[in-house]
Amino acid sequence: MTGQLVQYGRHRQRRSYARISEVLELPNLIEIQTSSYQWFLDEGLREMFQDISPIEDFTGNLSLEFIDYSLGEPKYSVDECKERDVTYAAPLRVKVRLINKETGEVKEQDVFMGDFPLMTETGTFVINGAERVIVSQLVRSPSVYYSGKVDKNGKRGFTATVIPNRGAWLEYETDAKDVVYVRIDRTRKLPVTVLLRALGFGSDQEITELLGDNEYLSNTLEKDNTDSTEKALLEIYERLRPGEPPTVENAKSLLVSRFFDPKRYDLANVGRYKINKKLHIKNRLFNQRLAETLVDPETGEILAAEGTILDRRTLDRILPYLEKNIGFKTAKPMGGVVEGDVELQSIKIYAPESEGERVINVIGNANITRDVKHITPGDILASISYFFNLLYKVGDTDDIDHLGNRRLRSVGELLQNQFRIGLSRMERVVRERMSIQDTNAITPQALINIRPVIASIKEFFGSSQLSQFMDQTNPLAELTHKRRLSALGPGGLTRERAGFEVRDVHYSHYGRMCPIETPEGPNIGLINSLSSFAKVNEFGFIETPYRRVDPETGLVTGHVDYLTADEEDNYVVAQANMKLSDEGEFLSEDIVARFRGENIVTNRERIDYMDVSPKQVVSAATACIPFLENDDSNRALMGANMQRQAVPLMNPESPIVGTGMEYVSAKDSGAAVICKHPGVVERVEAREVWVRRYVEVDGQTVKGDLDRYKMQKFIRSNQGTCYNQRPIVSVGNEVVKGEILADGPSMELGELALGRNVLVGFMTWDGYNYEDAIIMSERLVKDDVYTSIHIEEYESEARDTKLGPEEITRDIPNVGEDALRNLDERGIIRVGAEVKDGDLLVGKVTPKGVTELTAEERLLHAIFGEKAREVRDTSLRVPHGGGGIILDVKVFNREDGDELPPGVNQLVRAYIVQKRKISEGDKMAGRHGNKGVISRILPEEDMPYLPDGTPIDIMLNPLGVPSRMNIGQVLELHLGMAARYLGIHIATPVFDGAREEDVWGTIEEAGMANDAKTILYDGRTGEPFDNRVSVGVMYMIKLAHMVDDKLHARSTGPYSLVTQQPLGGKAQFGGQRFGEMEVWALEAYGAAYTLQEILTVKSDDVVGRVKTYEAIVKGENVPEPGVPESFKVLIKELQSLGMDVKMMSSDDTEIEMRDTEDDDDHQSADKLNVEVETTKE
C-alpha cells in the first residue's frame, strides 16, 4: 500500500498520499477579520480620539479633551438580534473633559457616543438582523512612485507621484525639452525649481549646489521665470487659487495647510515607512561608484575612497556610519514656507553610463522618525533628487501591480476611516456650539452632538460597497467571503477603468493571493482570495511564510519567517518539493528556485528560503480540489467558484477522494459548533450539548463549570438554504479546546461535505448527454440523495394609514370559509399547515377611502342596494412557486414592547419550508469545473449496469474531458472507485497528491482491471456495450441554480404604465418577450394572424385584450385587434416633436384614436355580465 493514514478530527481517517511533511499548521482562516477588528477596538479607536483631541474654540479659551472610552455589554445576544431584526451592537461611552482656561474650571463627563456594531466570533456583523461581512480592500499604498513613459516621438521620460493616505498629490514629470515640471494637487504644471524656491532655496546658485549641476536642471532654471522665494510663492498661489489676490503670507499658509499640516495631510504609518524605504540614501547607493571619499567625521578614518563601487559588503560595513553622521548637511532655507533648518543627507557619486566623469548628488531624506505623519521639506527634496538621479539611470522605477505597492485595508482600518469622517463632522458642530453657548453653563454633554458619528457608522455598514450581505450558501462560501480581497469600492478602482495589468496574475501574488479563485465576468482579477497561509502585517501588506535556510550550514531549518513581497525580492526561494535529507540538507546540488519572478536553477549555496507547503500558493476553496495539478487553470477557476454554490443537502457525505483541507475549512468557517474549553461531554440533545470543564487546581485536574452549547435548528440562511446543526459527540467523550462538537450545514463528521459520492460512467446514451448534459438514475430521486431543504421567509406588516390602522384579522371580505381553514383566530396561518400557491398566510384588511364608483358599481348598488364595505383585502398570500409547509410563525407587537419601524403596529413573519428533490433542469457539477444540466432522469432498470448488477448513478459525456483539459476528474474517478472497493477515504493534497503510479497502485490493490475500465450492460436490452467504459466514484454537487426557482408562466398579470405591455421577469410576474428575432421568424413563416395576435391582443391592445378575454370566457370568436398602445405612444412622441401625424385606414378615412381613459366603460352591460358572472361564483 502507498500513502500513510492521517486522522482528521475525532471521526475520520484518510489515507494521505502527501510526500512533503507539513512544517507549519494552517493558521486560523478568518483571522484576517477578527484580528483587524480587535486592533480597531484596542488601538484604532484610541488613535481616532487622540487625533481630534483637544477641540478648542476659535478664541482658544475652551478646550474639549477625549480621555478614555469603554464599550458596554450588548443589549441582545447574536441569536436574539437575528430574531428581532436589530443590530448586534454595544454602547460606546467616552470620558470627556472640558477645560475653561479663563476660570481654570474643569468638567468631566461620560458621554454616550451611540451603539457600535460588534463582530461575532465567526467574523461577521449582524446589521438589522442580517449577517454581513466587511470585505478587505486592496488599494495602492501611500508612497512615492516613479514610472517611465515614452512620448509620441519615442523619447523616454519619467513621471513621479507622491501619494498620501489623504491630502494633496505632488507629481513630477519631464517634457520633450528635458525640463522637469511639478504639478501640485492636479493643477497646471510649474517648473520644479519654483517649488524649491518656495521652500526657501531662492537663488539659482542654492538650487544648483543642492542638486548638483546637470543639463536637466539648467533647462528647468531657464524655463523658470521666478527668481526669488517671494515670486515663487505668488506663482504657486495663483495656480492653486486662480482669481484671488495673491500675497506672500496667504501663499505660505496655503502651502503649509496643503502639505505640512498633520490634520490635512496624512501619510499614515505605512506611507512614512514606504517613503523612508524608497528615499533613504542607503537603498540608493547600492552598486554605485563614489565621487567623494567618505570619512568618519569623529575619527577622521577613511571608510571608502573615491571611485569605490559600493557592493553589498562595503555598504553593510559603512551602514552604521550612514545611519549616524556621514554626509549630513543642514540647509538653511530663507523666507520659505517652513521655518527652521532642513536636515539632509547628500553623497556624490558618478553617473553609471557617463563616459566623462559626470558627478550627481544623491540626497536622502535623512532619518525622519516614524511618528512624523505629514510630508517634510526633506522628503520633497529627496523625492526631487531621486527624480533627477533617475534621469541618469540611478534608482529604479516602480511596478504598481507589485504587492509591495498594494496593501489591504481590512475591517479595522475601513471602520477607522469611517469613524474619522463622523468625528470630524462632530468636531465642527462642537466648535460652533462653543462660540454660541454661555461659557459658564456649558457641559461636555451639551457640546457634543453624536448624530454625525452614528450616521457615518450606519452608512458604512448599511450601504458601503465593501459591506456585503454574507454569502451563506454553504460553509465554504461563508469562509471564502470572509477572506475575499476586493480592488473595488471607495478609494479603489472601478470595473470600467481597470485595465489588463491590474487584473493579471503577478509574480508577487505567490503565496499571498490565489492565482485561480476569481469571478468570471467583468470583475475578473479585481476580486481575489487570500492564499491559505497568508497573513496581513501591521502596514496592511500581505505576508507569506518561508522556512529559513541557515546561511552557515546551508541546512533548511524549522524556523519560519513571514515575508512581504518587497522583502521577498531580496532573496532566492526554493520550492517546497525540493528533496531534503533528514537533517534538512538539499539532496541535489542544483536547485530550482524563484528570484524576483524569474524561475532559475541555481547552486544550493545561494538559497535563502524555502516554501513551507505546496498549497501555500492557492486559497482555501482551490485547495479543496483534488488533482488540481492535472486540471487546466480555467476549469480549476470554475471548480473553485462552483463549490461555493453547492446547496446543503439533506444527508451530506464528505468526499471519498478529498484533499485534507475539508476538516480545516469546515472548522474555521463558523458553521460548526466548536468546543471552547477542554472537558467531558455530559449530555447530548438535538438542541444543545453540555460540556463539563476540566480545571487545573494545584496540579490536579478537577471538574469545573458547565458549558452549554446551543445548536441552530432549521434556520433560514441568508440565501434561503437550510441552516441546521447536528451533534457528533456522545456522552462521556473527552473533548479538547477547538474540537468540533456539532456539524453545521454541508458537513459530515466534522468535514466539509458539499455533495455526494456517486457512481459515474463516462459514456453517451442516445444523445441525451449531448453538450455537457447529465443523465441520472431515478434512484438518486427516490433515495433523497440530492434532496435539499429550502426555507423562504414572508412578512406582512399592519401599518397606520391616513384612513385608520390596518388590521390583521380572519374576517376578510369576499373570501370563503374554505380559504380560511388553515388560519387561526388571529388570522395567521398555523404552523405545520401545507400551503399552495395563492393560499392565505396572513389575513389583513386596509381601510378604504370613499372612492368614485364606476358605472357598473353604481348599477349594482341600485339593483342590490348593498353598502360597499369600507375595507379592502390586502392579505399576504403564497407567491407562485412558494408552496410548502409552514415551519414557523413569528408575531411582533408594538404593545409587547418589540422594536418596530415607525408607523408599524404589528409584524408577522411566516417561514415556508420546501423539500426539493433533484429534477430535470437542475444544474450539477464536479470539483473540476465540469458542470452540466440534468436532461433526463432514467428509471433504475434502464441505466447501464456493472457485471455484478449494480446500475450506475450518472452518465457524463466523455467529450467533456479532452477539450476542457480537466483530467483531474478522470483520476478522481478511478481513485474513488478503488477507495470504495477498499472501504477507505483518501486525502490527496494539491500539488503533492497521488501521482499516476499511486493511482495505478491503489487500483491494483483494490483488485480492479488493469485498465481501470469495465464492461457495462445496457439496462434496456441486457446486451453488453461495445467498448469498455470508465466507471468510478466521483464527487458531484448540486448547485444553487435550481429549475424550481427559474420556471415561470403567466396568463394575465401586471402591465407597464406607459406602453401597456406586460412587465418582464419572474419577480414582476411578467410575460415572455417576443423580440425582433422572434418576429422575423414568424414573418419568415408567413404566419400573419399569429403575428398580429402577438403584437396586439396578447400584448398592448388595451381594448382588444379585454374583449378577447370576454370572448374566450363566453366561447365566442375572438374580435378584430385594435391599435396597440405602443403605436399610440410612438404617434404622441412624434407629435411632441411638432410633427402632424395622423393614422389613415385603407379607404383614406382618418382613424380616430381615443385614449384609454376617455373610453367610457365600453359596453358596460357586457362587461357587467362578465363581472356579475364572476362574482356569483
Swiss-Prot record:
Compositionally biased residues, Acidic residues: 1147-1161
Record flagged with keyword Zinc: no
Keywords (A to Z) from UniProt: DNA-directed RNA polymerase, Nucleotidyltransferase, Transcription, Transferase
Enzyme class label: transferase
SUPFAM superfamilies for this protein: beta and beta-prime subunits of DNA dependent RNA-polymerase
Region spans: Disordered: 1147-1177
GO BP term, example: DNA-templated transcription
Catalytic activity: RNA(n) + a ribonucleoside 5'-triphosphate = RNA(n+1) + diphosphate
GO MF annotations, alphabetized: DNA binding; DNA-directed RNA polymerase activity; ribonucleoside binding
PANTHER family the UniProt entry points to: DNA-DIRECTED RNA POLYMERASE I SUBUNIT 2
Protein family: Belongs to the RNA polymerase beta chain family.
Protein name, per record: DNA-directed RNA polymerase subunit beta
Organism: Bacillus cereus (strain ATCC 14579 / DSM 31 / CCUG 7414 / JCM 2152 / NBRC 15305 / NCIMB 9373 / NCTC 2599 / NRRL B-3711)
Lineage, broadest ranks: Bacteria, Bacillati, Bacillota, Bacilli, Bacillales
Gene: rpoB
